[in-house]
């Protein structure tokens, strides 16, 4: 009987010890089951490349970049800021790091609904004002990949991931596995705005 538990136990251990270790891992009783699924997906996607070109629907976002930027500039001043520290215990209180949900941007919301690979649950414009560090972290599940396209760069700003680094420059897009290590270091004084979309693998 114990031998039957060995494989799922090893799968959970593998997921738990990914860097950075999530100190909240076992506070959620369902997290070990998520860990087993994560390890299974890691085996399936071993050595697979995270690339925007693998998701043709995302070309619509790039193609309409100017319209998306114009709509953001027109609409966001009318909206209330939503703070990341209010929705996740991982984030320290920081009133310079906030977001706007894309459901409040009619043109973009309509566009995203035309792209089947996008999961809209966390779709948002993420805004960071001034210098900032988001320390190494990772998502609970690897079911989704994370897509970024930069609306405003806001000065020197680099996202570091297991597969390399990405500069947040206006109009640049990037996709990565956010269940793996990533951190953000922003030394620029300006406002960085990034459209964040989750993509089904």
PLM regions: where:
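A short glycine-rich, His/Asp/Glu-containing loop-to-beta-strand
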Residues: 111-132, 143
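Conserved metal-binding segment of the jelly-roll/cupin
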Residues: 167-181
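A short hydrophobic beta-strand segment most commonly corresponding to one strand
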Residues: 146-150, 175, 190-201
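Short beta-strand His + acidic residue motifs that chelate non-heme Fe in jelly-roll/DSBH
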Residues: 134-137, 158-160, 176, 182-188
């Amino acid at each position: 009987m114990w031998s039957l538990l060995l494989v799922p136990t090893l799968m959970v251990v593998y997921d738990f010890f990914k860097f950075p270790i999530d100190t909240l891992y076992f506070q959620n009783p369902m997290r070990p089951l998520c860990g087993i699924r994560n390890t299974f997906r890691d085996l399936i996607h071993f050595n697979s490349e995270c690339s925007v070109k693998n998701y043709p629907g995302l070309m619509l976002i790039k193609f309409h970049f100017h319209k998306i930027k114009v709509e953001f500039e027109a609409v966001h001043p009318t909206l209330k800021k939503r703070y990341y520290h209010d929705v996740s215990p991982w984030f320290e209180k920081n009133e310079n790091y906030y977001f706007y949900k894309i459901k409040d941007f009619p043109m973009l919301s309509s566009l995203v609904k035309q792209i089947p690979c996008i999961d809209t649950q966390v779709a948002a414009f993420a805004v960071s004002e001034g210098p900032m560090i988001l320390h190494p972290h990772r998502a609970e599940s690897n079911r989704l990949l994370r897509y970024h396209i930069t609306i405003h760069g806001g000065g020197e700003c680099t996202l570091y991931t297991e597969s390399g680094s990405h500069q947040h420059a206006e109009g640049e897009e990037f996709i990565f596995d956010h269940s793996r290590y990533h951190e953000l270091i922003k030394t620029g004084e300006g406002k960085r705005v990034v459209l964040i979309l989750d993509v089904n693998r």
